[in-house]
Curated annotation (Swiss-Prot):
ATP binds at residues 489-497, 571. Residues 876-1006 form the Guanylate cyclase domain. This is Receptor-type guanylate cyclase gcy-20. Residues 1083-1108 are annotated as: Disordered. It comes from Caenorhabditis elegans. Guanylate cyclase involved in the production of the second messenger cGMP.
């Protein structure tokens, strides 16, 4: 005993000092296309098996594991969000998953940024994820498409095939074949001895599209490599199409090269496999027998991993898959009910990779911690993966080898059909980075084919390349060739002349687009006195609201016109210029500019009193005026959106033929009615060359331009101007805050031009009211550095700005409206809040009222109207009672009784919602329902009640008491048809009650029924069998009913097709220990002479009914 106590003490001390490794697991749970291969319910427990192995091998003995599970559903955006939660909220040390390509790329990118190790598995087959130079913290154990392409290249070399055709389709799987296509295309480009002669994509796989494609391919190649989605019957249809197209001869060879493949086999839902030619998934009508298609498979090779051959699955792997399924009920998955479906009884195809991935991580981490045991190294992806080189035995018994870069050295196999038309493993290919070792398992190539196919037939693909008789053909060919040459020359000359003519016409047409006639311009008429001192056409009296164009008629620099029912701003140019062809080309291209953050260039007016350049009018003015005159406060999101808009517009300009703006100021940044920045004033270099810039515009000019105004404007100068504009936005003041400085613009310009170690720049004091990202301030300072070479490019600026996003996707216009609403009167807000609260409370009260009373009755009571009693000539009344409920309740606490009834009645309520049935009362274990009121439904009331009753009994087969799983619930049900009177009784607590002898009779049917049986009256039986039909009943015979005498009653057995009630031998129920009769507010007259009964809250039961 003393030794045992010491041992327990040591264990407790050991546990207290265990550190926890937080493991993030990412799965796809409900994506139907990947459930069989990587589904959560059939693979997640593999980490527990791997954990046991880690413990058995004494890896990471000082650490325990804590698992956090996220479901990405193979969605790129969802995976990105979930991995951010894991990294920032859950603070995991490693991520295992995800299992799909697009999600995998998103997670690998983020993990590389956070330097957290990621081990991916399953369907992550794209070569991008395995690119260690790109994702240095990600390891994948999946067979990727790059390895497959290398194996294909080696097979082509082995058999002397220099060219091939690639056919693929993304129908049914948008990831697998798209990745395969990229690597096959890359392989064909990078290898001079292997050429991809033709590649074609089939958008929608049908027998017609397959045959059309094959006929086209027959003109391009004989070695055909194909990739299709698995589990859709596409491969079978493709091979069938080769037969129908006459291409299943020895001349052709078809290679299915793809990851996630089972080779000649197809998975079934029960975990078994069958041959591909027997595939019935998504079966396309081929018109051929399976035997005919099987014969055509003799011209097929499969390149895949050892999952393509069921005979390679070891006993060790079979035991592993059994553990995966059985341990899903353990922590942290606790998947019992959700995993109970029969389709989840077999482990996912790639569950073994999950276990191997987790073990590889533990192996690498253990080795890393041996070198440096500091805690920070747990999630240091670069450090952990520096020891990723390893070789270990996988769960399936095969050797798993990773090199120092984390790339898996994979073993790929070539499968073929033998002479007996049965699949066999023909060769293996060991793929190590770029080297492939080919090992054939056959003794002679005759086992593969009688004659090796040629990549190019001797007479060509059309059979016309064999030399013909020169003497016979020479004269005819010469005449035809000469004729063709003459026609070609004539056609070429005519085509050239026509092209030149059309090009000249097109240029003239496009020139007409930017040349605006002065007569087409109608000057805007002012409604009021013209605004004075408008220093730019974008300025205005207020930017809080949209300004009317009538307030803008003419300024010093601009005139405002109507042109084609659109308001335009015409900039005045006091010069006349004759434009050459290059300048006209510039105007044509500017006219075609279409970007959300560039103001539309309309054109030039050359025939007016002076030269005018026309631009689209922006109603909210310029950014300069918004900053200087707006009374609306800008928050950080508003500022960031404005800066981002400017960077996007500037990026478009720098990427275009213009290369730079040259005169970027905040006055050029216009704001439209959606609060979006539109950069204006770009281009027109030939016009600006002869114009002197205004002094105040030089506040945005770069120092190098101020020192030499004759030099050409460069993109670096735009970046400087961008920095000045950003300072205006962040400080909500003009450039260099002239209003609050003593210096005049000339002095500031001189100081900027002078430069020095501490050059003059605007202040970046943003105040305390707005929180600005410090990284944004650093970026602004980088933009206005003295040396142009040290300033970031616009691409770098955009990249930095994208990195500063806070994850919000709010539109700026919506944000502005939110700001305006925020600054609305407090009275309006309070009224709105109170109105919302009142509406919500009204909704809650309505929901509660509609649960207590029928909607039409409740609506009348709400309106203060009297609900008159109403007679319903024919309805069906339903009573039920839980058998031996008192005995069952005696084994439960009061709270457990409530939970039991809540679970049971929740199921019943769901069944009621599927039928036109009104639930009157539930008191204790009693249940009263009626159909045919308050809405009359003809004779359908008996059908709805019957189906509901059958549904109740059917649901009990799967219902389990949570705290007493061995116990079973059984019901006794009674049904009667007849007339009733329904009305509302009471004022303080009004109840919708039923009155009539039919109610009492239905209650007697229940109390005189048997467990698990539906007891119906003769009238109900007549309605079921003669009126509505479709139900099976059985006569019980004559029964003495209390208060009714002798009655013939019946059992409802079920519908003609559908659920059937259990046999009369009811299942064993809880032993009756005591009988407690409880009658709630029920009006039940003397049982012997009662002609009318009423029921408001409970049923009138017999001695064998219990209520708790």
């Amino acid at each position: 005993m003393r030794i045992l106590l010491l041992l327990l003490q040591n264990i407790l001390v050991f546990c207290q000092f265990l550190q926890t490794i937080k493991v993030g697991l990412m799965f796809s749970k409900d994506t139907a296309s990947v459930i069989r291969s990587v589904g959560y319910r059939t693979s997640a427990a593999a980490v527990l098996v791997a954990k046991d192995r880690i413990r058995a091998e004494h890896l990471l003995d000082q650490y325990d594991f804590n698992f956090t599970i996220k479901f990405d559903e193979c969605s790129e955006s969802l995976a990105a969000g979930k991995v951010v939660e894991l990294l920032t909220h859950d603070n995991v040390d490693v991520i295992i998953g995800p299992t799909c390509n697009r999600a995998g790329v998103a997670v690998a990118s983020l993990a590389d940024f956070y330097n957290v190790p990621v081990f991916q598995w399953g369907l992550t087959t794209t070569a991008d994820i395995g690119n260690f130079s790109r994702y240095q913290t990600t390891v994948t154990l999946s067979l990727d498409t790059h390895s497959i392409s290398l194996a294909v290249r080696e097979i082509l070399r082995q058999y002397g095939w220099s060219e091939f055709v690639f056919i693929y389709s993304n129908d049914g799987d948008e990831e697998k074949c798209a990745a395969m296509k990229d690597d096959m295309e890359k392989m064909g480009i990078e290898n001079s001895d292997v050429t991809m002669a033709y590649m074609i994509q089939i958008q929608t796989v049908t027998m017609e599209s397959l045959q059309r494609t094959l006929l086209e391919v027959s003109k391009r190649g004989r070695i055909i490599i194909a990739c299709f989605a698995s589990g859709r019957g596409f491969k079978k249809a493709f091979i069938a199409s080769t037969v129908l197209a006459g291409m299943s001869t020895e001349e052709y060879l078809y290679v299915f090269a793809e990851p996630q493949s089972r080779g000649f086999y197809v998975d079934e839902a029960d975990g078994k496999v069958h041959y591909s030619w027997d595939d019935t998934d998504g079966q396309l009508v081929t018109g051929l027998t399976n035997e005919q298609i099987r014969d055509a498979y003799g011209k097929v090779l499969y390149i895949c991993d050892n999952m393509g051959e069921p005979t390679t699955i070891t006993t060790q792997y079979t035991n592993f898959t059994s553990q995966v399924i059985s341990r899903m009920a353990e922590q942290p998955f606790n998947c019992v009910q959700d995993c109970s479906n029969q389709s989840y009884k077999h482990a996912a195809t790639y569950a073994g990779q999950l276990a191997d991935s987790f073990y590889a991580y533990a192996f690498a981490l253990n080795k890393s911690l041996t070198q440096d045991p500091t805690r920070s190294n747990l999630k240091n992806g670069s450090f952990v993966l520096s020891n990723i080189g390893m070789t270990f035995q996988g769960v399936g018994g095969e050797a798993v080898t990773l090199d120092e870069s984390g790339s898996r050295i994979v073993q790929v196999y070539m499968f073929a059909m033998n002479s007996s038309l049965l699949p066999y493993m023909a060769a293996s290919l060991l793929v190590n980075v770029s080297e492939v070792v080919f090992t054939p398992f056959y003794k002679s190539e005759s086992e593969l084919w009688s004659v090796r196919p040629l990549s190019r037939p001797k007479c060509g693909f059309t059979g016309l390349e064999c030399p013909a008789d020169f003497v016979k053909e020479y004269l005819v060919y010469t005449i035809i060739a000469a004729f063709i040459v003459i026609l070609a020359l004539l056609a070429g000359c005519a085509g050239l002349l026509y092209t030149m003519h059309m090009k000249r016409k097109e240029m003239e047409r496009q020139d007409l687009l930017w040349q605006v006639a002065f007569v087409e311009l109608q000057q805007v008429q002012s409604k009021s006195r013209a605004e004075a001192s408008m220093h730019s056409f974008a300025s205005g009296p207020s930017t809080s609201t949209k300004m009317t164009v009538e307030s803008r008629t003419e300024t010093t620099n601009f005139i405002f016109y109507h042109y084609h029912q659109e308001v335009v701003a015409a900039k005045k140019h006091d010069l006349l210029v004759l434009f050459d062809a290059n300048q006209k080309s510039e105007f044509r291209q500017m006219r075609n500019f279409d970007n959300d953050n560039l103001n539309k260039f309309i054109g030039l007016c050359l025939d007016g009193p002076q030269l005018l350049s026309l631009w689209r009018f922006c109603s909210r003015g310029s950014l300069s005026d918004v900053i200087s005159k707006s009374s609306m406060q800008m928050d950080s999101f508003f500022m960031f959106s404005l800066i981002r808009d400017i960077s996007n517009g500037l990026y478009f300009i720098h990427s275009s033929f213009l290369k730079c703006h040259g005169q970027l100021t905040s006055r050029c940044c216009l704001i439209d009615d959606r609060w979006q920045i539109k950069i204006s004033g770009f281009g027109l270099k030939s016009v600006r060359t002869f114009e002197n810039p205004k002094k105040e515009d030089l506040l945005w000019a770069s120092p190098e331009y101020l020192r030499n105004e004759d030099q050409e404007r460069l993109p670096e100068g735009d970046i400087y101007s961008f920095g000045i504009i950003c300072a205006e936005i962040l400080t909500r003041s003009s450039a260099f805050d002239l209003e609050n400085r003593k210096e005049k613009p000339d002095v500031i310009i001189y100081q900027v031009k002078k430069g020095g170690h501490n050059p003059t720049r605007p202040s970046l004091d943003t105040g305390e009211t707005v929180v600005i990202n410090p990284a944004l301030l650093h970026l602004v300072r980088d933009c206005w550095t003295e040396r142009p070479s040290e300033r970031p490019s616009i691409e770098q600026v955009r990249s930095h700005l994208n990195g500063m996003k806070d994850g919000r996707k709010t539109n700026l216009m919506d944000h502005v409206f939110n700001m305006l609403e925020t600054y609305a009167s407090t009275l309006e807000e309070e009224v709105s809040d109170r109105t919302k609260e009142l509406t919500e409370e009204k909704k809650k009260s309505d929901v509660l009222l509609y649960r207590m009373l029928p909607r039409m009755v409740a609506d009348k009571l709400k309106l203060g109207q009297t609900v008159e009693p109403e007679t319903f000539e024919q309805v069906t009344i339903f009573f039920s009672d839980v058998v031996q409920f008192t005995t069952l309740a005696g084994k439960c606490t009061p709270l457990q009784v409530v939970t039991l009834l809540n679970d049971l009645y929740t199921i019943f309520d769901g069944i009621i919602e599927q039928n036109d049935v009104y639930k009157v009362e539930t008191i204790g274990d009693g249940y009263l329902c009626v159909s045919g009121l308050p809405h009359r439904n003809g004779n359908d009331h008996i059908r709805h009640i019957a189906r509901m009753s059958l549904g109740f009994l059917s649901s009990l087969e799967f219902f389990r008491v949570q705290h007493l799983p061995a116990e079973r619930i059984n019901l006794r049900i009674g049904i009667n048809c007849g007339s009733v009177v329904a009305g509302v009784v009471g004022l303080t607590m009004p109840r919708y009650c039923l009155f009539g002898d039919a109610v009492n009779t239905a209650s007697r049917m229940e109390s005189n029924g048997k467990p698990g049986q539906i007891h119906v009256t003769a009238e109900a039986n007549r309605m079921l069998t003669q009126v509505v039909g479709g139900f099976r009943t059985e006569s019980r015979g004559e029964v003495i009913i209390k208060g009714k005498g002798v009655m013939e009653t019946f059992w409802l057995l079920g519908e003609e097709s559908g659920y059937t009630a259990p046999s009369k031998a009811a299942p064993k129920v809880i032993q009756h220990r005591q009988s407690i009769r409880s009658i709630s507010p029920i009006l039940e007259k003397n049982a012997e002479g009662s002609e009318t009964s009423s029921l408001s809250v409970d049923q009138a039961g017999d001695n064998n009914s219990e209520t708790v």
